[in-house]
Structures are given as C-alpha cells and as structure tokens.
C-alpha cells in the first residue's frame, strides 16, 4: 500500500562580505525567508514553481518554497538555484542542505541507513561544480543532518550586465520505492531547508579562511 506525505522545502537566503577586515551582519527574518546581508555582495535563492505533484507550473515565477504530496518511486522537480546579483563583488558561495527527522531517516535502509547521503534522496548534483565538504554535520539535539556544498570557484558579478545564476544544486528528488508505509509515516512532514551563503573574497587568503570567518561570526 502506497502512502503520501508532505515534504516542505524552505529556501533560506544569506549574504555576507568583508569590509576592512571586519565582518558585520544585518539580519532580517520572516516566516518564509531568512536573509543575512553584509557588504557589497547580493544573492538570491529560488526554485521552479511546482504543484503538489512536483510538476512545473507554466508562467509562474520562480519561488522560495514548494509543498509536495509524495509517492515512493516517483521523481519530483526541485532545483534550488543560487544567483549572484549583478554588481556584486567577487565572492565565495555555498549551499547548505538541512534535513530534520534524521533519527527516522537513518533507519530507512532504502535511503542508506546510517550511511545516508543526500544523493540517496536527490538527483542531478554536479560534483565538479558543487563540492561536498567532508562529512555532514549531525545535530542530535535538533535531530538534523546538514550537508555543505561549495561552488568550485569564486563568482564575480561586479562587471556583469546581468545577474549570474549558477547551476542548480540538484534538479529533482525521489523517495525510493522500497520505502515501507511505516517508514514513510515516520518521515511524514519532513522538512528540507536549503541555505544560500556568500562572502566577499577580498581580504581573505582563500575560501577556507573566508568560510571559517563566516562561521565564527554567524555561529553557523
């Protein structure tokens, strides 16, 4: 027997830069979008508008969240895309993917069990462009797992006449058909949150130093 569930994806926007060696952050938050801004870097994160069956809605602008009714074995369109806005200084960018209900996810053999990887749930990650960083971060207290993907090079929008959209982090997701009804019920309402981050490249010796400073300043 096949069951359906709702998978909620929240797109979170974040921006940052360095100024005279100092990082300062301005934050604004509402129920749908968490925006972090600093300096001369601006990004957006969005995805194709789809209906609850995961089908693209023609003529609908890209949006920051979609809701799904899922059936195991069916692929659903989802293409979180980070765009560097024209006029932005050269910046390092990354995307973080956080899933809740991890204690339930790791019990599902079809998703890899304790060896769960994001690729067991989504399709289309271009690993030559988006570089997975080390092991995922597991937060047992909040029951989440987070994967970090850094873009393979700094992106410069300072001399461009148009915004610079990067390749989507992935383009679809699927709940494998071997998932049982009990397993499906356990992850009903699971939330995936995709965060976009950018930090101005100037003033740092490289991307590692930049992200270390970003994480220290924001508590990421």
Spans of model-derived segments:
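C-terminal, structured domain-capping segment
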Residues: 71-101, 152-220
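Broad hydrophobic/π-residue packing in well-ordered secondary structure
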Residues: 22-28, 36-37, 81, 94, ...
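A surface/secretory-pathway sequence property marking extracellular, secreted
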Residues: 39-56, 101-148
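Acidic/proline-rich low-complexity IDRs
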Residues: 14, 19, 25, 95, ...
């Amino acid at each position: 027997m096949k069951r359906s569930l709702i998978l909620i994806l929240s797109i979170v926007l974040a921006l940052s830069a360095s100024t005279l060696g100092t990082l300062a952050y301005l934050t604004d938050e509402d129920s749908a979008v968490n925006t972090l801004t600093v300096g001369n870097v601006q990004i957006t994160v969005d995805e194709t508008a789809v209906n609850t069956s995961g089908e693209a809605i023609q003529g609908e602008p890209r949006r920051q969240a979609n809701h799904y009714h899922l059936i195991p074995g069916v692929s659903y369109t989802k293409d979180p895309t980070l765009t560097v806005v024209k006029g932005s200084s050269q910046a390092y960018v990354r995307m973080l993917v956080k899933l809740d209900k991890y204690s339930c996810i790791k019990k599902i053999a079809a998703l890899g069990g304790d060896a769960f990887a994001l690729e067991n749930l989504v399709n289309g990650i271009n690993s030559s462009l988006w570089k997975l960083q080390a092991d995922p971060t597991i937060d047992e207290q909040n029951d989440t797992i987070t994967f970090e993907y850094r873009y393979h090079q700094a992106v410069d929008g300072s001399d461009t006449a148009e915004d610079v959209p990067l390749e989507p982090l992935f383009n679809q997701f699927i709940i494998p058909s071997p998932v049982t009804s009990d397993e499906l019920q356990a992850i009903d309402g699971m939330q995936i949150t995709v965060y976009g981050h950018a930090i101005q490249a100037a003033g740092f010796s490289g991307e590692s130093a930049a992200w270390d400073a970003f994480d220290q300043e924001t508590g990421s």
